[in-house]
Amino acid sequence: MHMPPHLPASPPLSWPQRLEALLKDLTNFPWKSTARTLRERYSEDRLGLTASSLTFTTTMALVPLVTVALAIFTAFPMFAKLQSVLQKWLVTSLIPDNIARQVLGYLTQFAGQASKLGGAGIALLLVTAVALILTIDHTLNGIWRVRTRRSLGQRVLVYWAALTLGPLVLGVSLSITSYAISASKGVVGVMPGGVQFLLDVLQFFMVAWGMAAMYHFVPNTWVKWSHAWAGGMFVSAGLELAKKLLALYLGKVPTYSVLYGAFATVPILLIWIYVAWIIVLLGAVIAAYLPSLTSGIQHRGRSHGLQFQLALETLQQLERVRSDAVKGLTMQQLAQLLRVDALQLEPVLETLSELDWIGLLNEEFKGEAARYVMLANPDATALAPLLDTLLLRREESTQNLWEKGRWPLLNVRDVL
């Protein structure tokens, strides 16, 4: 039997070729669409208001979280030496240098005082820490448009694992780095610039990894690691830039130091926490909307009747393929046909499913996604339930519009 010749494997790319490919990808990336999406989501999701809420909750939860971390290191004496390393790294990498030392001192002092609290006080601290965790969970699931949340037990289990294992993993990696630095200083006296650069890069990627892990695991939906990493890299770069700008501003314009004196650390810390949360939420938007951005699908701005319009367009597409050999369309196919982001389309599909107008067809074929199919008979199904749900509720004040517009007499076929 004649066998087709094997095609030679493509040679591995050299570093210059990889760099050229990366630059090409960065050049072709939809930067303008990304900026527009960030602006729209910031306004529509009220991320500024959400960041304010998270700033307050974070301020209240800082001491409880540090107390939990200290308790973990106390429970494992073998990791006691990692405690100071981790504390210093977290503060210096996430907080501007101008206030890092004061914040570290305050947190250590307050966390030490927490051990003197009674059972009720400790319980209150834990409730405050859990409140921050649940607020983050609610916010990120809202950005991903997730309707079905994990059970409280699952959320507590996931976040408790993060609170216990996270500090230990970070502490081990940082202690190794600290040991390498100490050893190198003992040999060469002064840390070379190249070593400092590598440490800065390590710090950058550790922050990016932490954010990527949060974007991947927290939303109760499937998030690709590549998308989570894109959001994490944005956050890490944004935090570094924000720290530099805030440090430059505080150095040039010492307004807070003049007004508040030694108390200036508090308002500066609040401003920084707010800015940091804005960056983290924008990173979540990038991770959530990256599939649509890279595929060229535009996010439709919020407008009156948009969900009703998307529902009609969805019904039109499903009716069009009703008699095809392959029944129905997947969510991604619908998003492509309607030129809309899948995150915007998902609540519309849920509404149509609740009305029993469409259904989700799951067939056990390898590599084939579930498809939405038309269930309603357009000629015998009244349009009123959809109008009432997505466009205008039928109430006493709108009764005349409903009657004179003859909306109760319309059926689905009339709008297809």
Curated annotation (Swiss-Prot):
The chain crosses the membrane at residues 60-80, 117-137, 156-176, 187-207, 222-242, 268-288. InterPro entries: UPF0761_bac, Virul_fac_BrkB. It holds the Pfam family Virul_fac_BrkB. Keywords: Cell inner membrane, Cell membrane, Membrane, Transmembrane, Transmembrane helix. It is found in: Cell inner membrane. It is a multi-pass membrane protein. The keyword Aminoacyl-tRNA synthetase does not apply. Its main location: membrane. GO terms for cellular component: plasma membrane. The keyword Cell inner membrane applies. Belongs to the UPF0761 family. PANTHER family: INNER MEMBRANE PROTEIN YHJD (PTHR30213), UPF0761 MEMBRANE PROTEIN YIHY (PTHR30213:SF0). NCBIfam families: yihY_not_rbn. HAMAP family: UPF0761. This is UPF0761 membrane protein Rfer_2991. The lineage of its organism: Bacteria, Pseudomonadati, Pseudomonadota, Betaproteobacteria, Burkholderiales.
